């Protein structure tokens, strides 16, 4: 009988290298928020991938960056604390970009950790095959990686091979989660993240990190219909106007797009009601951050 393997894998890397795209690809559902704006992942969203011979729990950590406020400080602590809890580390980089100071900072941190580290070069669909080996060699000068695997999370290139590589390093272990469970976050948290993703896609650079979403109510009204009421928080009146849009058009489009993803997640029809409120400087208010679901890790 084939042994069953299981383990926890941390995905770490600079903002926007494709960590959330990878999690969503291997889980097969949209769990982690995706956006072209930096610092969009605010929590350790666990994606659970269950196969017949293995269960892999992915921790999609916030991108490494220099904190500018209490929320940013929290995001950094989540990223670094995660490294002590896991069986292996995926260090993901954008193969289409030069090695930056952020990458160097992460590699210096990883050198001090005994956990296996896989270098995952993402976005190989954007570079010519001849350019791949020289870029890999540059990373090998910084540290010894357990494995080096090029992939495209967006296109799915080489992802199945990488999953097999991960499984070869996992210990024998049980299923930690039921077969049909894909995340350890409450559905309300994931719903709020889906709403926030649509706002990030539809608003300008000024808005992204000032946005928080709280799901106030989520009620199953009948067998195939769920009612969701959520509040979108911004820090300034001008941002409120941007999110709502002229004649409420922007907010209506946010609701329409979010509803489609939420219906796919829940497998039910969704009635979604959204409000926009100003909560000045909320990212520096610890209690408010906790209320939004970005809880402090406890020992």
Curated annotation (Swiss-Prot):
One of its GO terms (biological process) is ribosomal small subunit assembly. Residues 13-20 are annotated as: G1. SUPFAM superfamilies: P-loop containing nucleoside triphosphate hydrolases, Prokaryotic type KH domain (KH-domain type II). GO terms for molecular function: GTP binding; GTPase activity; ribosomal small subunit binding; small ribosomal subunit rRNA binding. It is found in: Cytoplasm; Cell membrane. Keywords: Cell membrane, Cytoplasm, GTP-binding, Membrane, Nucleotide-binding, Ribosome biogenesis, RNA-binding, rRNA-binding. Its main location: cytoplasm. It is a peripheral membrane protein. Residues 151-153 are annotated as: G5. One of its GO terms (cellular component) is plasma membrane. Residues 60-63 are annotated as: G3. GTP binds at residues 13-20, 60-64, 122-125. PANTHER family: GTPASE ERA, GTPASE ERA, MITOCHONDRIAL. An essential GTPase that binds both GDP and GTP, with rapid nucleotide exchange. Plays a role in 16S rRNA processing and 30S ribosomal subunit biogenesis and possibly also in cell cycle regulation and energy metabolism. Belongs to the TRAFAC class TrmE-Era-EngA-EngB-Septin-like GTPase superfamily. Era GTPase family. NCBIfam families: era, PRK00089.1, small_GTP. This is GTPase Era. It comes from Staphylococcus saprophyticus subsp. saprophyticus (strain ATCC 15305 / DSM 20229 / NCIMB 8711 / NCTC 7292 / S-41). The gene is era.
């Amino acid at each position: 009988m084939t042994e069953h393997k299981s383990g926890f894998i941390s995905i770490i890397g600079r903002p926007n290298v494709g960590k959330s795209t990878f999690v969503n690809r291997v889980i097969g559902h949209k769990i982690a928020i995706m956006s072209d704006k930096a610092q969009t992942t605010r929590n350790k969203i666990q994606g659970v991938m269950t196969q017949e011979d293995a269960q892999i729990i992915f921790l999609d950590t916030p991108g490494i960056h220099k904190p500018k406020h209490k929320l940013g400080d929290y995001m950094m602590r989540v990223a670094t604390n995660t490294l002590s809890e896991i069986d292996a580390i995926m260090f993901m980089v954008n193969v289409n970009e030069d090695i930056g100071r952020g990458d160097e900072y992460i590699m210096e941190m990883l050198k001090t950790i005994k956990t296996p580290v896989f270098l995952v070069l993402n976005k190989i669909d954007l570079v010519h095959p001849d350019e791949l080996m020289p870029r890999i060699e540059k990373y090998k000068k910084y540290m010894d990686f357990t494995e080096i695997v090029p992939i495209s999370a967006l296109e799915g290139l080489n992802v199945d091979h990488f999953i097999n590589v991960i499984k070869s390093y996992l210990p024998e272990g049980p299923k930690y989660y039921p077969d049909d469970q894909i995340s350890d976050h409450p559905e309300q948290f994931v719903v709020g993240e889906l709403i926030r993703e649509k706002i990030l896609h539809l608003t300008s650079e000024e808005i992204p990190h000032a946005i928080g979403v709280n799901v106030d109510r989520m009620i199953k009204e009948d067998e195939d219909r769920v009612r969701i009421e959520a509040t979108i928080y911004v820090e300034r009146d001008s941002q409120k106007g941007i999110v709502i849009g002229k004649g409420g058009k922007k907010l209506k489009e946010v609701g329409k797009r979010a509803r489609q993803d939420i219906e796919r997640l829940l497998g039910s029809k969704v009635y979604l009601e959204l409000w926009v409120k100003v909560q000045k400087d909320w990212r520096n208010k610890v209690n408010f951050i906790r209320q939004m679901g970005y809880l402090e890790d406890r020992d």
